[in-house]
Design a protein with these regions (language model features):
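Small-residue (primarily alanine) positions within well-ordered alpha-helices
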Residues: 13, 31-32, 61, 65
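Short N-terminal helix-initiation segments at or just after the protein's N-terminus
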Residues: 20-25, 43-45
Length: 127
């Protein structure tokens, strides 16, 4: 089996975005996370009438992965249909993803979590 390309991973994020629950903004976001074992775990944004209670696609993908037994460091890449928000950048850092692929306007961008969130907060700051 050949490794999944970043463009394939982004295509998976595009496909799952159609299942987002975004009745208020109509802004559908999908995320596909590639685990080291080759599995792709998907997530979508889920809005709520009480706006702060909505959940981003990246967080639903990682929450699903953790519920299924994955842990930080088990992930190779994450692809999102939009530039990750600040909170999701922190999640990408925490989960130990090697690279993040996303659309920003008409461009496809690939960055590391450190590039997305320089000087990030991590567990080393807790001691």
């Amino acid at each position: 089996m050949s490794p999944l390309s970043d463009s394939d991973l982004l295509a998976a994020a595009d496909a799952v975005a159609a299942r987002a629950y975004a009745p208020y903004s109509s802004f559908h976001v999908g995320c596909a996370v590639l685990a080291r074992d080759g599995r792709v775990i998907e997530g979508v944004n889920v809005e709520n009438a009480a706006y702060p209670l909505g959940v981003c696609a990246e967080r639903t993908a990682f929450s699903r992965a953790v519920a299924e037994g994955y842990r930080p460091g088990d992930f190779v890449a994450a692809a999102s249909t939009a530039s990750p928000c600040g909170g999701c950048r922190q999640w990408l850092q925490e989960m130990g993803v090697e690279r993040v692929v996303f659309r920003n306007g008409g461009r496809v961008v690939t960055m590391t979590p450190d590039e997305l969130l320089p000087e990030s907060f991590d567990s080393s700051k807790l001691s």
